[in-house]
Regions:
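Dinucleotide-binding Rossmann-like beta1-alpha1 core, especially the glycine-rich loop
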Residues: 52-128
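Glycine-rich FAD pyrophosphate-binding loop
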Residues: 25-51
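Mid-domain catalytic core of redox enzymes
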Residues: 27, 220-340
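Conserved Rossmann-like nucleotide-cofactor binding loop
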Residues: 16, 40, 244
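Active-site/ligand-binding neighborhood in enzyme catalytic cores
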Residues: 94-101, 105-236, 245
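Short, Lys/Arg-enriched N-terminal segments with co-localized hydrophobic residues
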Residues: 1-6
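C-terminal catalytic lobe of FAD-dependent flavoproteins
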Residues: 321-381
Length: 381
């Protein structure tokens, strides 16, 4: 037997890790080892066929690919066929299902209006939006966009359930991107590309990792692996996990993350449980934030259905960075340590958890491609 010497070690096999591995193996023809502490590839995009119902389920919550980035769209189409999917979301408010994002229909149903045109909607928004000299937090951001009534009904408690903080305690960026439509368009996204991978995300990521130069070792943490290895063995180490986990030996306080708890229920001989794939529950008296019914996605066929209610939590796998001043200040300290590691040990920190930044899927892939071009390709030349 001979020992393979890997040129690059990638920690984490989510979108970021898989993209960088694919690029290094195919563009540079170099050996890559990916390790992941979980028992599966795909990070939080991992999906699987549920044995009882035959329905494709995303283990860590619904993922809809949407983007205006043609470059990334062309890239992902190398590894999967994608099916156009215009995602719609309902919110259960005042004992009825209303469409999200806020559009003319939402306003008519929740505010007893009879708006018919975009001009009328613009006038209503102008009259309703709260004016601030400077916006300092998410409550002000939201009220400046939808006014007091919709803020109270749809956003205030929903945000609290998501973050365990009221909008006034969160950076304005959290609710900056809530879409508002001045028409009847009830699609959740208005991006050029909106799609789901025909055979699921796990298959898509599997197809990214087929190159002979890529090896995979699951159920392996970075700390365990490094007990028998040395940083100097590798041309580069790409770490895509939580940055504070990597520097857990430093005396900097830990960063905050939000997690999700999932409660799965199966219903035999039921066509659909709810009218839509995703229903938000913004009211305070319901503990979960939303219910996802996966059968709706790609119009899957089954005599049964499966629904997953999602509850946000401080405990569990880190999913979302919590953007407030404390965490952003701490992250800067970690970033200084990361820059030292990059310069001295060729350890690079890339991705949502490593950059302590919320990325959509297309942004995670674009970020990984940019990293490869700037930091790996440029140093090879």
């Amino acid at each position: 037997t001979y020992i393979i010497y890997y040129m690059y070690l990638i920690v984490g096999c989510g979108l970021t890790g898989a993209t960088i591995a694919e690029r290094i193996s195919s563009e540079l023809n170099e050996e890559v080892l990916i390790i992941d502490k979980r028992e599966h590839i795909g990070g939080n995009c991992y999906d699987y066929i549920d044995n009882d119902t035959g329905i494709l389920v995303c283990k860590y919550g619904a993922h809809i690919y949407r983007s205006n980035d043609e470059n990334v769209w062309n890239y992902i189409n190398r590894f999967s066929e994608w099916v156009r999917w215009e995602h719609k979301v309902l919110s259960y408010v005042d004992n009825k299902f209303v469409s999200v994002p806020v559009n003319i229909t939402t306003v008519n149903e929740l505010c007893d209006e009879t708006i018919q045109t975009s001009d009328e909607m613009d006038t209503w928004l102008e009259k309703t939006q709260v004016k601030y000299d400077t916006i300092t937090n998410s409550e002000e951001m939201c009220k400046s966009r939808v006014g007091n009534v919709l803020y109270d009904k749809m956003f205030k408690n929903y945000t609290y359930k998501q973050w365990n903080k009221y909008p006034e305690e969160l950076n304005a960026s959290v609710l900056r991107n809530i879409p508002i439509r001045n028409n009847f368009d009830c699609r959740y996204f208005d991006h050029k590309y909106q799609a789901l991978p025909k055979k699921g995300y796990t298959k898509f990521i599997e197809n990214m990792l087929t190159h002979k130069n890529i090896s995979l070792q699951l159920n392996t943490t970075y700390d365990e692996y490094m007990k028998t290895h040395n940083k100097s063995e590798f041309k580069g180490i790409i770490f895509t996990g939580p940055i504070d986990e990597y520097f857990s030996h430093s005396n900097i306080e830990k960063l905050e993350y939000r997690s999700l708890q999932f409660d799965i229920k199966r219903y035999k001989n039921m066509n659909y449980y709810q009218p839509n794939s995703v229903v938000n529950y913004p009211e305070y008296n319901v503990p979960f934030t939303r219910i996802v019914e996966y059968k709706h996605f790609l119009n899957q066929q089954s005599t049964d259905t499966i629904v997953v209610s999602e509850t946000s939590s401080d405990i569990g796998e880190p999913y979302y960075p919590v953007p407030n001043e404390r965490n952003l200040t701490l992250y800067k300290k970690y970033k200084n340590l990361a820059e030292y590691e990059e310069t001295n040990n060729h350890v690079f920190f890339v991705g949502r958890l490593a950059n302590y930044k919320y990325f959509n899927m297309d942004e995670a892939i674009a970020n990984a491609l940019h990293f490869f071009n700037e930091k790996i390709m440029n140093t090879v030349k």
